[in-house]
């Protein structure tokens, strides 16, 4: 899935839907994602826990380079105790957000 982002030389807004599996609930993962988005800058969206133990992220970035960095950092795990074993990344389309925050 990694090549989707780097190969699409997106002009303008890039939107992706990610589902993170692993040790991603109860370890500050959602807040880590929000902090990461703010640190990188130019990223807005939402993050929430799913009932199946995964975390879902809708993210939009000003460029594919910014999005690629965001995805790379999420794969590493945005908090010390989180561990992402699998990250599904797909190009997506959803209403634009003006900020990045936890949805639940």
Question: What is each stretch, according to the model?
Answer:
Residues 3-104:
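Intrinsically disordered, low-complexity, mixed-charge
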């Amino acid at each position: 899935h990694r090549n989707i982002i780097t190969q699409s030389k997106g002009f303008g807004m890039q939107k992706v839907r990610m589902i993170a599996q692993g040790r991603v609930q109860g370890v500050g993962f959602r807040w880590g994602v929000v902090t990461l988005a703010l640190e990188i800058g130019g990223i807005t969206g939402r993050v929430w826990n799913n009932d199946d133990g995964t975390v879902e992220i809708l993210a939009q970035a000003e460029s594919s380079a910014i999005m690629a960095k965001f995805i790379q950092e999420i794969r590493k795990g945005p908090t010390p105790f989180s561990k992402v074993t699998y990250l599904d990344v797909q190009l997506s389309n959803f209403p634009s957000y003006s900020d990045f925050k936890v949805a639940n």
